[in-house]
From Swiss-Prot:
Origin: domain of life: Bacteria
Gene: bioB
NCBIfam families assigned: bioB
Matching InterPro entries: Aldolase_TIM, BATS_dom, Biotin_synth/BioAB, Biotin_synthase, Elp3/MiaA/NifB-like_rSAM, rSAM
SMART domains named among the record's database cross-references: BATS, Elp3
Taxonomic classification: Bacteria, Pseudomonadati, Pseudomonadota, Betaproteobacteria, Burkholderiales
UniProt xrefs under Gene3D superfamilies: Aldolase class I
Official protein name in the record: Biotin synthase
Residue positions binding [2Fe-2S] cluster: 110, 141, 201, 273
Enzyme category, top tier: transferase
Alphabetized Pfam families for the sequence: BATS, Radical_SAM
Similarity comment: family membership: Belongs to the radical SAM superfamily. Biotin synthase family.
Residues bound to [4Fe-4S] cluster: 66, 70, 73
Length: 335
């Protein structure tokens, strides 16, 4: 005789920093895989249409030459990765790329620049880009590095919807990945963004040699923000020759999916986004990520300087899964 399963209601937002202590997040990671996915899917369905994903597109508007020494990044000037330093992309090229992304179904257009911190004249140019993309009817997001006083307010005035600034990893592992920017620097920029009234896009990277507890530490940091980020990109390390992390041990795909599930459980209202590293995932792995609560993907041919599944492949996958892109009337690629 089967006993009916009655789900336990999950709070919408953690009421305080004590809601998700590290030990509690670590316990989620230790759950049997199927139990974890079941719980994450329940939480997901309480707040979202489980068969809908948001499509976002990411354009590098200024590539290479970054003075930071992030061990994973091919755009760092510290490493010889074959990525040349370019100047800021002209406005008309940005608008052309945004139109193409929109034509392919993207709702959010993200613009990334390889800077430690934007200079005033750079910010003025980016503000113009934000206005032009907003005029197309798309959500806007930028990632420009650390912000100085007043810069977040300038971006808000330009109409910016989201600012991306990742924590990358847990505080305990952070020093093994970067030395030119402190963890507190990142938190300070996020606080400026929040105080300016801009939505926060903040996540991290897994597969950099961190432990499962480090992954729990990253999620705990994100979940205990007040409030937690509206958008949480989870990146799977893309190993680039010439960076210190080239040749690192590849993360077990189930560990990546676990990270997605724990992010969904601890941040039930956030958009949990599959970001870098999707091109190495099988369709089955991506489907499990959707089951675990991912509801946004970066969509298009290029994700900054690394590969990303092509548009048609993404459309076919969503169609095979019976899923649809947010804002579109049917499964992506269907008439």
């Amino acid at each position: 005789m089967h006993t009916a399963y009655i789900p336990v209601p999950t709070p919408v937002r953690p009421p305080s920093a004590e809601r998700w202590p590290l030990a509690a997040v670590a316990e989620l990671f230790e759950l049997p895989f199927l139990d974890l996915l079941h719980r994450a899917q329940q939480v997901h369905r309480q707040h979202f249409d489980a068969n809908t994903v948001q499509l976002s597109s990411l354009l590098s508007i200024k590539t290479g030459g970054c003075p930071e020494d992030c061990a994973y990044c091919p755009q760092s000037a510290h490493y010889d990765t074959g990525v040349d330093a370019d100047k800021l992309m002209p406005l008309d090229e940005v608008v052309r790329a945004a139109r193409a992304a929109q034509a392919n179904g993207a709702q959010r257009f993200c613009m990334g620049a390889a800077w430690r911190s934007p200079k005033p004249h750079h910010l003025e140019a980016v503000a113009e880009m934000i206005g032009a993309v907003k005029a197309l009817g798309m959500e806007t997001c930028v990632t420009l590095g650390m912000l100085r006083d007043g810069q977040a307010e300038q971006l808000k005035a330009a109409g910016l919807d989201y600012y991306n600034h990742n924590l990358d990893t847990a505080p305990e592992f952070y020093g093994k990945i970067i030395s030119t920017r402190t963890y507190q620097d990142r938190l300070d920029t996020l606080q400026q963004v929040r105080e300016a009234g801009i939505n926060v896009c903040c996540g991290g990277i897994v597969g950099m040699g961190e432990s499962r507890r480090d992954r729990a530490g990253l999620v705990a940091q994100l979940a205990n923000m007040e409030p937690y980020p509206e958008s949480v990109p989870i990146n799977n390390l893309v190993q680039v020759e010439g960076t210190p992390l080239a040749g690192a041990e590849t993360l077990d795909p189930f560990e990546f999916i676990r990270t997605i599930a724990v992010a969904r459980i601890t941040m039930p209202l956030a958009k949990v986004r599959l970001s870098a590293g999707r091109e190495t995932m099988s369709d089955s792995e991506q489907a499990l990520c959707f089951m675990a609560g991912a509801n946004s993907i970066f969509y298009g041919d290029v994700l900054l300087t690394t590969g990303n599944p092509q548009v048609e492949a993404d459309r076919r996958l969503l169609q095979r899964l019976g899923m649809r892109a947010e804002g579109l009337p049917c499964a992506a690629g269907q008439a």
